[in-house]
Amino acid sequence: MFSMVTEFMNYGQQTVRAARYIGQGFMITLSHANRLPVTIQYPYEKLITSERFRGRIHFEFDKCIACEVCVRVCPIDLPVVDWKLEMDIRKKRLLNYSIDFGICIFCGNCVEYCPTNCLSMTEEYELSTYDRHELNYNQIALGRLPMAVIDDYTTRTILNLPEIKNA
């Protein structure tokens, strides 16, 4: 008889302990219910990047001296620099510059070590395409100015908003 009483007491203690654990889990769930969502509705709302964000590389053709420092500091030897030596002025003349963003790891070494600051990181992060060969950007595509995150053509088109005028 005494064993039945102790088993009944143990059952009661286990029931109280289980109810306490369920209550703790429920309180954690309720505390998360009052928080703001972390995600954004991507095509309609754009992510505002931080100041040190490393996006697409912007290239200024006129500043480049074809020194190939960017190729030497790149961990994967990615930038392709084609140049020709001008014998009359004894300087290199840049013919072609390209970066394949399908392979680029966006480490920023090329931007950091460029002696003429012809390379810079932009806030542009939408580089997705259906064909991986479209990710190979030449100097014309690299020289294109980045589109502002706030004034995006696709968002304006989807939401039928007027174009933002720069003052």
UniProtKB/Swiss-Prot annotation:
GO terms for cellular component: chloroplast thylakoid membrane. Its cofactor is [4Fe-4S] cluster. It catalyses: a plastoquinone + NADH + (n+1) H(+)(in) = a plastoquinol + NAD(+) + n H(+)(out); a plastoquinone + NADPH + (n+1) H(+)(in) = a plastoquinol + NADP(+) + n H(+)(out). Its EC number is 7.1.1.-. NDH is composed of at least 16 different subunits, 5 of which are encoded in the nucleus. Belongs to the complex I 23 kDa subunit family. This is NAD(P)H-quinone oxidoreductase subunit I, chloroplastic. The lineage of its organism: Eukaryota, Viridiplantae, Streptophyta, Embryophyta, Tracheophyta.
